[in-house]
C-alpha cells in the first residue's frame, strides 16, 4: 500500500484521488519532487514517499492556499479543476533530522498511537526522513538491567517517570517521578513497534538511542570490581576516564 495515499485520506476523504504518485529514482542521487498537470488530478514524481508527501504539501500550500501544519489545518475541499502546475524541486541534503531528547518529555511523553500517526504524517509532509525514535527506551533499560542481575523493583527505582525521560535519555538523572507501572512497559513496546513500522513504510530512517556509558549509581553494588566514575557537579567539563571492561558488555 502507498503510505502517502493513506495519509491523504486521513487528512481529507477523497483527497488521495486528486494526486497520481509515481516513485522514480533520481539520476543525481538527491531528493526531489516534480508536479505536473491539474484539472481532475495532479501527477507527482518523486524519488521516495517522503519527497512525494513534501511535494503534495507544497502544492496544497502554494497552489490551493491550504495549510497543513503541526499547529493545525486549514484544508478546504479542493476545487473540481485543480490549478495547473509544472514545477521541480531538488536538494542534495539527504538527511532531514527531527526532534531532540527533551521532546520526549515536554511533548510526546503521553502520546497514543493516534497522535503519533498524525505526527509521522506531518513529518512526511514536511520532508523529514530522519526522526528520533526514543519511545520505549525505558523497556530496553529494564530488559538490560534484568540481565545484569537487577530485580524488577530495583530497575523501577532507577528509571524515572515519563515527564523526565529527556533527562534519562541524556544520562543525567535517575529515580525521579517513578516508579513506572508494569503495563507501561508493555504499552510502550507495542506503541514503538507501530511507530517504527509507519516510519519505515515512508522510507524514514529512525534514530535510536545508543549506549554512552551511563549506568545506575547502584551498579557498584552489583559489580564492586568495576571502575565507575561518579558524575561530579561541574558544568561543561569532561571528567570521564577510559571506560571499564564492563562497558563493553
Q: What does each of the following model-derived ranges do?
A:
Residues 24-26, 38-45, 49, 74-75, ...:
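Aromatic-lined carbohydrate-binding surfaces of glycoside hydrolases
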Amino acid at each position: 500500500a502507498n503510505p502517502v495515499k493513506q495519509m491523504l485520506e486521513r487528512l481529507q476523504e477523497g483527497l488521495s484521488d486528486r494526486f497520481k504518485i509515481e516513485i522514480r529514482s533520481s539520476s543525481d542521487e538527491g531528493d526531489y519532487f516534480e508536479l505536473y498537470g491539474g484539472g481532475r488530478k495532479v501527477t507527482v514524481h518523486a524519488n521516495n514517499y517522503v519527497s512525494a508527501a513534501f511535494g503534495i504539501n507544497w502544492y496544497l500550500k502554494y497552489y490551493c492556499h491550504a495549510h497543513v501544519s503541526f499547529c493545525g489545518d486549514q484544508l478546504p475541499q479542493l476545487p473540481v479543476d485543480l490549478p495547473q502546475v509544472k514545477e521541480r524541486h531538488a536538494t542534495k541534503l539527504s538527511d532531514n533530522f527531527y526532534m531532540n531528547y527533551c521532546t520526549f518529555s515536554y511533548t510526546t511523553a503521553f502520546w497514543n498511537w493516534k497522535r503519533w500517526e498524525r505526527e509521522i504524517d506531518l513529518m512526511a509532509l514536511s520532508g523529514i526522513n530522519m526522526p528520533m525514535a526514543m519511545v520505549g527506551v525505558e523497556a530496553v533499560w529494564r530488559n538490560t538491567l534484568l540481565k545484569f542481575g537487577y530485580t524488577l523493583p530495583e530497575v523501577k527505582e532507577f528509571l524515572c517517570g515519563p515527564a523526565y525521560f529527556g533527562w534519562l535519555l541524556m544520562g543525567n538523572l535517575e529515580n525521579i517521578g517513578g516508579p513506572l507501572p508494569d503495563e507501561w512497559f508493555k504499552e510502550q513496546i507495542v506503541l514503538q513497534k507501530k511507530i517504527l513500522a509507519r516510519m519505515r513504510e515512508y522510507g524514514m530512517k529512525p534514530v535510536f538511542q545508543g549506549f554512552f556509558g551511563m549506568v545506575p549509581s547502584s551498579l557498584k553494588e552489583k559489580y564492586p570490581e568495576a571502575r565507575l566514575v561518579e558524575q561530579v557537579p561541574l558544568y561543561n567539563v569532561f571528567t570521564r576516564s577510559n571506560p571499564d571492561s564492563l562497558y563493553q558488555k
